[in-house]
């Protein structure tokens, strides 16, 4: 369903998909962002963001709500953008939020990004979004440039998807020890 659904959504006007197989089969532009597991597999949130910016400098979209959006996520994103992207002259970047009070958090994040000189940084929102939720958060004054809409776009309401979240609980170090 995801592969054909991504194609149908693209025909209907969606800009792209996180489903890379739809890109390979149908030419639907693939794009996306990091997962919470990416952030958690590093010793620090900043290290995860910096590494992502180094690996994907022209498409850096950082997931800023793994721990604390306003106290660490956005500040660490700004630091990574400043240290990795700005020296290369790259101004195209984004942050993504997929939990919490999206309207409030995006307003605060926009102010923080603007004050740090990242007016060009886009803000993306996701988290089981549909047209009603999007309309509601926009009515609340959310500062969202992009919406990541997936399951509610291509899944029948009468046969919904399983609403689960995957987060990394531990990693195995090179010496074989398991670290929570």
Question: Which residues fall in each region the model found?
Answer:
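Active-site lining segments that contact anionic ligands and/or coordinate catalytic metals
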Residues: 92, 120, 144, 163-165
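Glycine-rich phosphate-binding active-site loops on the catalytic face of alpha/beta enzymes
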Residues: 143-161
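Buried, small/hydrophobic-residue-enriched core segments of structured protein domains
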Residues: 1-118, 129-133, 139-140, 153-155, ...
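Residue-level recognition of the GNAT/N-acetyltransferase active site
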Residues: 126
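Flexible C-terminal active-site loop/helix
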Residues: 155-180
């Amino acid at each position: 369903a995801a592969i054909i659904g991504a194609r149908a959504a693209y025909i209907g006007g969606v800009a792209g998909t996180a489903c890379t197989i739809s890109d390979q089969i149908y030419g639907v532009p693939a794009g996306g962002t990091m997962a919470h597991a990416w952030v958690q597999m590093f010793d620090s949130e900043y290290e995860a963001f910096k590494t992502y910016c180094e690996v994907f400098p022209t498409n850096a979209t950082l997931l800023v709500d793994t721990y604390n959006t306003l106290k660490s996520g956005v500040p660490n994103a700004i630091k990574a953008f400043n240290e990795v992207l700005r020296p290369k002259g790259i101004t195209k970047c984004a942050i993504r939020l997929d939990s919490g009070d999206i309207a409030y958090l995006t307003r605060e994040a926009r102010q923080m990004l603007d004050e740090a000189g990242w007016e060009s940084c886009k803000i993306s929102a996701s988290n089981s979004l549909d047209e009603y939720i999007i309309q509601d958060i926009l009515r609340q004054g959310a500062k969202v440039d992009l919406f990541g809409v997936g399951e509610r776009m291509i899944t029948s309401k009468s046969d919904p998807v399983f609403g689960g979240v995957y987060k990394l609980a531990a990693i195995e170090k090179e010496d074989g020890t398991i670290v929570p």
